[in-house]
């Protein structure tokens, strides 16, 4: 920026009425007092001697190569905005409708910026320590429609190309109000962003600080609002498979957005997203934004337990007839009702449903109803099914639990091994190395070059196979077909071996049932129950481990959900135990 060349421009600033102009690298005049950029560019004295091509270039603004060492002036929230945009683009490529990015996520993000007083309000406060005078930008607290769009423009979002900026008839995005700050405040020694240092130190009560994990919370809330066919476990798995930017999301920042120092602690992620952690952040985000009641989850919606149960039954190669049993469990417990499935963050008793975990828990309960899973009955029923299948090879085969167990154990062990190898080979350091200051930059880049060189040399020595192309994302992790003899498909098998005719209805041959949790915890630890593997049968452990791996959740997390389903299904049993415990307490008192 050249201050001397801008002295000839003597008009007053429309924002602060000051006469102190500088010249941007694009050739436009900007106010050094309030940083307001005008549409006026430097005038040419004699246009007769200049060809038409140069006149067009001047009209667009004098394009000068900006020194990339300095980069753009940007705020931390703009970085998160860029990550959200990339994630929305990735979701759209996975088949999600464009309304999620252009409408739902767009409005959620605008609401966050307004609630956190970073934009879309009369007095935006960017930091708690630096005192700035913010000029009114003619914004109202409720009038969002009049504001420029944030997420529906080009991938640069708030950063438009210089060619677009010079056109007066094009409405360029301006996500943040104009700040009146001194020149020394426009650069940060300890971070690439303007407010990186202060953002990392900020601890304002009642304001939710944005983080990279919370971007996934925004994405899931948008998916839930649209009732899309992506569950939270699917979303986290797509992140793990690098179909959705997360770990190295900052790598997609424009080259001019310099990121170093304190920015590293804000945008760099060194762990995979955890289901429980992200679910808690979803509740935090929804509560902070004061979001209204979400659209109802009806029987036709993908997130309804009946549909999700069908999906997971196909996933784990269980018979199709089991869907009738899961539907009965859903109906008996009432977890398929619209009121139960509704997500209302601002309600007094807000219910938070883990739709995928709940559906899997229903299947576990159905398996216990049919096979008991006590390391005894399921094997006895398997012997009966095996004998029947040997005698009646032309008839519809009965479901053999032992054979299914052997097939699934082999399949899940292979899948786990590949998953663990992929995690072990994952490169946590991205292509763009992060550094703490400009002084460290050459050293960090040199080290990165050495690492890449060593990796190439090592790969040639061990003669490693070239990188396999990414598989297209799918909602299913297993594929079962009738033609595969090594991995037989059990979808068409019958449950006649475990059911019996009683009147006009079918009932289970097994009349017993054991509760996963006898007594629920009432302390303040927020855990309904505990899970110790040694206290449960091997069959039950295998079922929990199988579904826990599919959803990438802890086994104890699924066990807790199973216990809650059983509590709703067997209310009488739990009421009896509660009465007995209360009587024993009374006798102790007397």
UniProtKB/Swiss-Prot annotation:
Residues 40-68 are annotated as: B-reader. Pfam families: Rrn7_cyclin_C, Rrn7_cyclin_N, Zn_ribbon_RRN7. It is found in: Nucleus, Nucleolus. One of its GO terms (biological process) is nucleolar large rRNA transcription by RNA polymerase I. Its main location: nucleus. Residues 263-373 are annotated as: C-terminal cyclin fold. Residues 74-262 are annotated as: N-terminal cyclin fold. One of its GO terms (molecular function) is RNA polymerase I core promoter sequence-specific DNA binding. InterPro entries: Rrn7_cyclin_C, Rrn7_cyclin_N, TAF1B/Rrn7, TF_Rrn7_Zf. A zinc finger (RRN7-type) spans 4-39. Residues 69-73 are annotated as: B-linker. The modification N-acetylmethionine is found at residue 1. GO terms for cellular component: RNA polymerase I core factor complex; RNA polymerase transcription factor SL1 complex. Keywords: Acetylation, DNA-binding, Metal-binding, Nucleus, Transcription, Transcription regulation, Zinc, Zinc-finger. Zn(2+) binds at residues 13, 16, 31, 34. The keyword Transcription regulation applies. Interacts with FLNA (via N-terminus). Component of the transcription factor SL1/TIF-IB complex, composed of TBP and at least TAF1A, TAF1B, TAF1C and TAF1D. In the complex interacts directly with TBP, TAF1A and TAF1C. Interaction of the SL1/TIF-IB subunits with TBP excludes interaction of TBP with the transcription factor IID (TFIID) subunits. Interacts with TBP and RRN3. Part of Pol I pre-initiation complex (PIC), in which Pol I core assembles with RRN3 and promoter-bound UTBF and SL1/TIF-IB complex. Although it shares weak sequence similarity with GTF2B/TFIIB, displays a similar subdomain organization as GTF2B/TFIIB, with a N-terminal zinc finger, a connecting region (composed of B-reader and B-linker regions), followed by 2 cyclin folds. The RRN7-type zinc finger plays an essential postrecruitment role in Pol I transcription at a step preceding synthesis of the first 40 nucleotides. Belongs to the RRN7/TAF1B family. Component of RNA polymerase I core factor complex that acts as a GTF2B/TFIIB-like factor and plays a key role in multiple steps during transcription initiation such as pre-initiation complex (PIC) assembly and postpolymerase recruitment events in polymerase I (Pol I) transcription. Binds rDNA promoters and plays a role in Pol I recruitment as a component of the SL1/TIF-IB complex and, possibly, directly through its interaction with RRN3. This is TATA box-binding protein-associated factor RNA polymerase I subunit B.
